[in-house]
Design a protein with these regions (language model features):
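N-terminal maturation segment of proteins
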Residues: 1-315
Length: 315
């Protein structure tokens, strides 16, 4: 029911998320679990929602700027999974696209408040967003490609009214992203710290976000250094097996030059990924895991942009 909408990125929107998390936690305190599933669910919700509130208290929930998972990408990535078969579906895309400019203006207000409080992402993270804004809106970027490839599933053109709305709103969204990039460069980048290191307090929050657990950071770093040394030694030994006397870089170059390990074009890459995914499901299902039917097919796709990296969306 919200396919035409975009999240509220204003300070009030972030406040609403925090308020919902706080009210949900209060209601959880009144819930009595009836079985082990309830116990696990309640514990997981308390951990996630509690961490959300801690992150909000530190101000980092509304200051995120990076190359992969921040509102700068979210306002564009949201269109990747929208169906594009029918005129009605394209009309929905056009309507949602028309809301991008307002969302990015809201984001500016939120980021300005965070910047004024001294809560700013690293310079490299801010610069990555600036670069992506330019890439999205370039002559061969995402928005130009979306307009050029807009057609129905049977290959026929969009109805004239839908096509006109789409063009108007895509051009407005592109203009909004250009404006955002310029604004970030002028308003946020000068205040962004040059160091990538986030600091212990922020790192502790982020590690809990990714791990779902609190770990001893010193012990974890020591383990990480040991693992890095082990992997480095393994890489060097493997390089010798591939080509005696070769460094790791030379062994990689040797493999890249071998036609047996080459893929040409996105179609070959997509087919290779799909084959590996299907093979993995076939090997694991019924032997190591009972994989539900909706997850039997992992659809491998090539994202319309070349920013960020590989990502997965649930079924």
């Amino acid at each position: 029911g919200h396919d035409e909408d975009i999240d509220d990125l204003s300070p009030a929107g972030f406040d609403a998320h925090v308020d919902l998390a706080r009210r949900t936690l209060e209601r959880l305190s009144e819930v009595e679990p009836t079985d082990a599933i309830d116990e696990v669910t309640i514990a997981a919700m308390r951990e996630r929602l509690g961490l959300q509130l801690e992150t909000a208290d530190a101000g980092w929930d509304r200051a995120a700027l990076n190359n992969l998972a921040s509102p700068v990408q979210g306002c564009r990535d949201i269109f990747d999974l929208m169906p594009t078969d029918t005129a009605e579906q394209w009309a929905t895309i056009a309507t949602r696209m028309g809301k991008v400019p307002a969302a990015l203006e809201q984001l500016k207000v939120t980021l300005a408040e965070s910047t004024d409080r001294g809560v700013v992402s690293s310079r490299r993270g801010v610069q990555a967003c600036i670069d992506q804004c330019a890439e999205f809106t370039s002559p061969d970027g995402y928005y130009a490609g979306l307009l050029a490839g807009a057609k129905l599933s049977d290959g026929s053109p969009l109805p004239q009214e839908v096509a006109a709305d789409l063009r108007t709103n895509v051009e407005a969204a592109a203009a909004a992203y250009r404006s955002l990039g310029e604004w970030l460069e002028e308003r946020v980048l000068p205040h962004a710290p040059a160091a990538d290191a986030a600091g212990r307090d922020r790192y502790a929050l982020a590690s809990r976000d990714f791990l779902g657990a609190t770990v001893d950071l010193e012990e974890t770093y020591q383990w990480g250094q040991e693992e890095l040394a082990r992997i480095t030694a393994d890489m060097e030994a493997t390089a010798q097996r591939i080509r005696p006397g070769a460094t790791v870089a030379e062994a990689i170059a040797h493999l890249k030059a071998d036609p047996a390990y080459q893929l040409h074009g996105t179609d070959e890459l997509k087919a290779w990924m799909q084959g590996k995914a299907d093979e993995a499901i076939a090997m694991l299902h019924g032997t190591h895991f009972d994989i539900p039917e909706p997850a039997h097919r992992i659809e491998c796709l090539i994202a319309p942009t070349h920013t960020g990296g590989i990502y997965y969306t649930g079924p």
